[in-house]
Curated annotation (Swiss-Prot):
Residue intervals passing through the bilayer: none
Listed HAMAP family: Endoribonucl_YbeY
EC number(s) stated in the UniProt entry for this protein: 3.1.-.-
Pfam families: YbeY
One cellular-component annotation, GO: cytoplasm
Cofactor names: Zn(2+)
Protein's name according to its UniProt entry: Endoribonuclease YbeY
Organism: Bartonella tribocorum (strain CIP 105476 / IBS 506)
Family: Belongs to the endoribonuclease YbeY family.
Location of this chain's protein in the cell: Cytoplasm
Its job: Single strand-specific metallo-endoribonuclease involved in late-stage 70S ribosome quality control and in maturation of the 3' terminus of the 16S rRNA.
């Protein structure tokens, strides 16, 4: 069981119950898919706005702009290994996710679910720094999202639009 802690720092995220339900479903599906469904841990999600996200992105990545999702693992972990007592933190910027969903012709909830799955995989040690890592992570995302009845998010994206 994983405890989910949700914080909202933007009035635009007006349905905290929906955020929790999407997070719980994405987390349960992702953990089961990577055979970590019996892990006992905790995850924290902050749903914020672009302005706040830009500050965090500048502080931690040196990029003075917003981004869709940032993940901060509580402990270093090798992909496939079980996490410690605290999985980590995921931060999601509402305006960026809304804009990307519109631009890519996706529903907001489907794109938000994708961002949550993407963040969870980062917390579990997966990355996309190399081509091999990116292919592995995208494959997992596709498989998890398919289990959630969400279309392949990469099928129509150009290389410049990818996360």
């Amino acid at each position: 069981m994983i405890i989910i802690d949700i914080m909202v720092k933007d009035a635009g995220w007006n349905d905290e119950k929906m955020l929790y339900n999407i997070t719980e479903k994405a987390l349960t599906t992702a953990m089961h898919h990577v055979s970590l469904e019996n892990v006992v841990s905790e995850i924290s999600l902050l749903f914020t706005d672009d302005e706040h996200m830009a500050k965090i992105n500048a502080q931690w990545r040196g990029k003075n702009k917003s981004t869709n999702v940032l993940s901060f693992p509580a402990f270093p972990i090798k992909a496939g290994n079980p996490p410690g007592p605290m999985l980590g933190d995921i931060i999601i910027a509402r305006e960026t996710v809304v804009l990307e969903a519109e631009k890519q012709g996706k529903t907001f909830q489907d794109h938000l679910t994708h961002m949550i799955v993407h963040g969870i995989l980062h917390l579990l040690g997966y990355d996309h720094e190399t081509d091999d890592e990116a292919h592995q992570m995208e494959k997992l995302e596709r498989e998890i999202l398919q289990k959630l009845s969400i279309k392949d998010p990469y099928i129509e994206l150009s290389i410049n639009d990818k996360i």
